[in-house]
């Protein structure tokens, strides 16, 4: 590429182009991921025997973590939690504020997104065989926070906490983990990147 062509390519067309591209991109990804998880939270089924609803959030958390990397995913889930506490009605069932016994799962989402992002940055999302353990690890972290918080908030023993905060959800979350473990490697394949490649192919670098 000639110097003149490179200059034209870098020249800003609108005011937004004056901002660093990475900052604009990352901000949009963080806000978009938080909104996506808030949308999935509205896929909500309440059960009579537990204060914790069945939602689609877990799938969004796993996808955000592996697709965005740990920094952006962590920021997205912190935004989701803080905005929800501040009044944005995007917790399950359009709830906002402190959601009591189920809030541990929200904290678990942050930790799980960071963990999945950390693993993805080391290639865990490039094949199904490597994605499955990463997704399972994310699920374990969510349950560790969620069930512990549930037990402390409602003064439950371990068996009660597991029966209300783990057993009703494990089958559905296993399906979500399997979906996420399949989608990420498929996305890499569709982009044309090699399985173990971590930089763009020649000619595609910015």
Walk through the language-model features, giving the residues of each.
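Residue-level recognition of membrane-helix boundary sites in multi-pass small-molecule transporters
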Residues: 71-72, 103, 130, 160
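Alpha-helical transmembrane segments in multi-pass membrane proteins
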Residues: 29-40, 61, 65, 76-84, ...
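Hydrophobic/aromatic positions within or immediately flanking transmembrane alpha-helices
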Residues: 74-77, 162
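Interfacial loop-to-helix junctions that mark the boundaries of transmembrane helices
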Residues: 19-24, 48-55, 96-104, 132-133, ...
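Membrane-embedded alpha-helical hairpins and interfacial helices in multi-pass inner-membrane proteins
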Residues: 50, 122-204
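Short helix-perturbing small/polar motifs within transmembrane alpha-helices
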Residues: 3-19, 39, 96, 102-151
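Hydrophobic transmembrane alpha-helices
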Residues: 2-74
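Interfacial aromatic-anchored transmembrane helix boundaries in multi-pass membrane proteins
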Residues: 42-53, 81-112
């Amino acid at each position: 590429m000639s110097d003149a062509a490179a200059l034209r390519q870098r020249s800003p067309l609108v005011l937004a182009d004056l901002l660093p591209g990475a900052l604009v991109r990352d901000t949009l990804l963080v806000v978009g991921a938080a909104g996506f998880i808030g949308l999935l939270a509205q896929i909500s089924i309440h059960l009579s025997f537990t204060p914790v609803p069945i939602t689609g959030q877990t799938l969004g958390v796993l996808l955000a973590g592996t697709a965005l990397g740990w920094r952006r995913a962590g920021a997205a889930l912190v935004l989701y939690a803080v905005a929800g506490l501040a009044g944005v009605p995007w917790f399950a069932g359009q709830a906002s504020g402190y959601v009591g016994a189920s809030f541990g799962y929200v904290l678990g989402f942050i930790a799980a997104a960071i963990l999945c992002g950390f693993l993805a940055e080391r290639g865990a999302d490039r094949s199904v065989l490597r994605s499955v353990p990463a997704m399972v690890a994310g699920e374990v972290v969510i349950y560790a926070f969620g069930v512990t918080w549930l037990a402390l908030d409602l003064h439950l023993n371990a068996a009660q906490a597991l029966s209300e905060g783990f057993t009703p959800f494990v089958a559905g979350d296993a399906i979500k983990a399997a979906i996420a473990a399949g989608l990420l490697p498929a996305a890499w394949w569709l982009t044309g990147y090699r399985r173990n490649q971590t930089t763009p192919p020649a000619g595609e670098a910015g």
